[in-house]
Amino acid sequence: MAAITASAQEGIYLGGGISLWRNNDVDKTSFSITPDVGYNLSEKWAVGVELAYAHKGYDGEDAISTNAFALAPYARYSFYENKIVRLFLDMGFGFSTYKEKHVDSVNGFEIGVKPGLAVKLNDNFSFITKVGFAGYRDDYYRNMNGNGFGVALDGENISIGIEYEF
């Protein structure tokens, strides 16, 4: 997943991600759009919310189409920063609804922590990534395998992007 974020120092920041994947072996196409908005309360703390829409479609004999929506508010704590690197934790919870064609929708939630890293490229741009998830998920759209507590370091839990600071 790629993410782009614009940020105002001690103010509003905007961002988002987009992903697109085509698997020819199983005729699967998937994409997601995840806009993000937040507010820097101080140099250490920010609050924000991520919205998400995800679609997966399987072609062929067993054509299946799924759609998911999610809303995930969070608090961001930056615990280390020097001239180039900033380390942070996004702590929050998310609510999702997941619908497969011709099947009832499934509602889910997650609560947990996503660690992140920002590397300053110049005065305005930073490379930013979030790697992993630690917490609890109950039928959340990124993990439809049921309920569980743990740590996830798969491709669904890694985002990479650029941040712009005004």
Segments from the language model and where they lie:
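Individual transmembrane alpha-helices with interfacial aromatic-anchor signatures
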Residues: 147-156
